[in-house]
Amino acid sequence: MNPLAARGPHRVTLATRADCSVITLTGDMDLDHVGPLRAALQEACTAPTAPERVVVDLSRLDFCDSAGLNALLHARSLCEQNRRTLTLTDPGPQFYRLLRITGADALFDLSYPGTADGWPDAAR
C-alpha cells in the first residue's frame, strides 16, 4: 500500500501505472480527511517521473465537501502547469451535484465508465 494512504474507512490510495496515476478515494472527503488527498494529488500532478495522465477514481467516495473540491481544483491547476491531464471517473450523485451547483462540472474531464454512453443519469 502507498505511504500516502490514510488509514480507516476514509482512504486515499495512489497507484502509478505505465499510462497514468490512479488516485482512489474511499469514504468521506472533507476537511478532516483531505490531507492525504492533497499529498497524493501533489505527487501525481508534479513528480517529474509521474505519467502525464492523472485519474481520480470516485466510485467509492461517499461524501465530498468544499475542502475536497478545493483540492481537486488545485490539482487541475497543477496538472495544467505541468502539462498533465486530470480525469475524474465515476462520480456519484452527491459529488456530481456538488460539481453542478458550483459550476465545476464544466472545469473537469468527467468519465462514467459504467454507463453505455459515458454520462450519468443525472446529466440527461
Predicted feature descriptions by range:
Residues 1-62, 74-124:
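STAS-like cytosolic regulatory interaction modules
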